[in-house]
Amino acid sequence: MYNNKLTIKPAIFLVAAFTLAMVSCQKKFDPKSYAPKQTFGGYAASNEVAASDLVAHFAFEGNLVDSVSNTAATNNGTSNSPGIKGQGMQVGEGNYAVFTPTDAIKNLQSMTIAYWVNTPINTKGIQTPVSFVNPDQFWGNMDMFFDGQASDKSVFKMHLFGNGGANEAWLAAWSIASPWDKWLHLALTYDMTSEKFAFYVNGTLVGTSTQAGFGAPNFATVPAIVMGTAQFQTNPTMTSATDHQDWASFVLGVMDELRIYKKALTADDVKALYNLENLGK
């Protein structure tokens, strides 16, 4: 009887040890490791979207470097701030950055420009995230700006010169509801074959505008791209056509993830870019 008890006790111990080992293994199992990657439009990361057509990308990760050309913009008072994806560029009153465009940008025909902005209302004047300088004209070769700013909405206007500067286009003044103090993804596409512009906010098409005879954007002679204000608000002004305007101001908030492509992204690609960057991917 004594010997039987001795035989049973080690057996019970072995069963208990095996059970504990199994439980331990089960606790370490992570079902997420088997889950497929989340994708949008077939992309798992924002850098995958139309990657071969990307001609400029400012991630603003502690610097003002375009990762495509590996050249930096000149800083005029901007600083680092939390962005939609990592760090962003804090602009603020009187501040901006200036980038000398590469040949890839100057030679654009069809194109997309997309970026994020998070800014409060500016009661002093228009806020211009991006301005492609035209040194001989009041307005730049491309201007994108918040105008008609109200507490619950803003008109967003876009102006461009095309066809060697012979044609000038003011796109429809689209209204954005509740645009302040939150991240907005803005994207403008242009297909030169159809001469059609499309404007997206947070991945959703807001409207289109066909400009007959517009041709290629007038970027061949653009000397600089201003990020954070209009070409005539820099110090000194970048155009001989005018000086500072009292109805114009600066982006007061943060910009992030500015990308320029040499094609008109599809609606699906714009949506994918918005979704992925919004998730920090």
Which ranges hold each PLM region?
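Extracytoplasmic low-complexity segments
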Residues: 2-4, 21, 25-94, 271-281
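Beta-strand acidic-aromatic groove motif in beta-rich domains, primarily in extracellular
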Residues: 123-131, 196-197
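Extracellular, beta-strand-rich glycan-interacting domains
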Residues: 55-63, 111-121, 239, 245-276
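Short, aromatic/His-centered strand-loop micro-motif at the edge of beta-sheets
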Residues: 159-185
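Short surface loop/edge beta-strand patches of beta-sandwich-type extracellular domains
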Residues: 35-49, 92-111, 170-176
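Flexible glycan-contacting loops in extracellular carbohydrate-active proteins
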Residues: 210-253
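Glycan-recognition/cleft segments
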Residues: 128-161, 216-218
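Short tryptophan-centered beta-strand motifs in secreted/extracellular beta-sheet-rich domains
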Residues: 115, 181-190, 199
